[in-house]
UniProtKB/Swiss-Prot annotation:
Enzyme class: transferase
Annotated binding of 3-methyl-2-oxobutanoate, by residue: 50-51, 89, 118
GO cellular component: cytoplasm
Pathway: Cofactor biosynthesis; (R)-pantothenate biosynthesis; (R)-pantoate from 3-methyl-2-oxobutanoate: step 1/2
Cysteines joined through disulfide linkages: none
Cofactor: Mg(2+)
Annotated signal sequence range: none
EC code(s) of this entry: 2.1.2.11
Gene coding for it: panB
Listed name of the protein: 3-methyl-2-oxobutanoate hydroxymethyltransferase
One Gene Ontology term from the biological process aspect of the record: pantothenate biosynthetic process
Keywords associated with the record: Cytoplasm, Magnesium, Metal-binding, Pantothenate biosynthesis, Transferase
Amino acid sequence: MSMQTAPIKKITLNHLQAKKNQEKIIAITAYDALFAQIFDPLVDVILVGDSLNMSFFNQNDTLNASVGMMLYHTKAVCAGAKIPFIITDMPFGSYKDEKTALKNAIRVYKETQASAIKLEGGKEKAKLVKTLTDEGVIVVGHIGLMPQFVRLDGGYKIKGKNEEQQKKLLEDALSLEEAGAGLLVLEGITTPIAQKITQTIKIPTIGIGSGKDCDGQILVWSDMLGFFDSFKPKFVREYLKGKELVQNAIKQYADDVKKGNFPNELESYH
């Protein structure tokens, strides 16, 4: 008689780390309870990303996202999604030193049901990662193209194109792993070095614009579903023409109202 595996009620870091070299991790962003509930049974990880500042608030970059903003949207996502591992981005300026980082990370844990926090930076952030993990906070690292450094870098630039960058990326990954990071996001990294990092470190890598060899993939939901069309990165694959579908539905609704076809008798009270 075969034993059936009980369904997972809540995905943990242990579940994700067990997928290393076994099964790809599926991750997506979400910013509210409605979409989090839709994504809930279909993904392993939901990132409440500071990307919301661009896709949700229509800003040019992520830099003026605030801790309050991230807490608000994380609470909403946690209300909608019960199964996935939920990661909250630490916004720009919220982890500038250990005291500030601890204060804000602890707020995330106390005020939301987030599973982990994510911060950008390489080996220079290793000491901070260790401090946070020593206090019981699960930290997700983020190296490569780092949106919070976009003004310093002069734009969104792919990393790993030369030997010096490749060496630094590998050193960054190893340092963050040693410091206690539970997962590592690789963004905008050339495929060969993303593959090497994934094969070298023991913790799972989640890629965005970093080739297919990472342990998992993440996309911004509004990019993937075709709602955000003002700019489309090379690495984005659209699985739906969401904006077009919604606009067509609104046009049909408006047409029905103008022609007196909505509401009809079945949609009215007597």
